[in-house]
Amino acid sequence: MDFSWTEEQKIWRRTVRDFAQKKIKPMVREIDTNKKIPENIIKDMARLGLLAPTVSKEYGGSEVDWTMACIAAEELGRADISLAIPVMYLVEAAWGYIFSRYGTHEMKETYLPKVTSGDAFIGIAVTEPEGGSDILGTAKTTAFKKGKNWVLNGEKMFISGVTESKQMGGIHLTLARTDPDAGHKGFSFFAVPLKHNHNVKTTLLEDMGRMGISTGGFAMGL
């Protein structure tokens, strides 16, 4: 079995490395000081297809495979970890992909083109104040049906992109228990917008490192 890089992968690595070293690396101190990734960098990443890159082309993504996504994350991380893990890889690539695979067509049409163009943020909200790894044993956020709507009650903590989602718009894929008797099958993801959402109260935390993206939490219905 041949594990060497394909020519396409080599070109992709060189392209992302060149962008990261020329555009991102000189801005690292400014990113850390301002605790924000400049909009021009986000837009440049969008033009290169680095935002939610695993999303299908139908919704504006690059539709790259996971090897290509990991190559991009590695090269971005050489310049600044804020862009490599929370934005490009962990949040945008992974959860953009999950949403594109399991979300409704209407919701995907509404949010994904804005995410891939850098005009909205998509994040994940699973961790809670009492735990994040043992979700089955610690998750207390619940959701119940009320008419045609769902009502969520609970709190999420240590969530990437709280400020970005609140300012730019977008969604956090939020895990809630919908059936207390169904074990691990009793959970569902809900697309929760933070911008202009008066039913959600957000909080912010101070990070040590990866300063370019916010970390915080939000409470629903409490």
Regions found by a protein language model. Name each.
Residues 118-127:
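A short, Trp-centered hydrophobic/proline-enriched beta-strand micro-motif
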Residues 47-118, 161-171, 182:
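Internal helix-loop-helix
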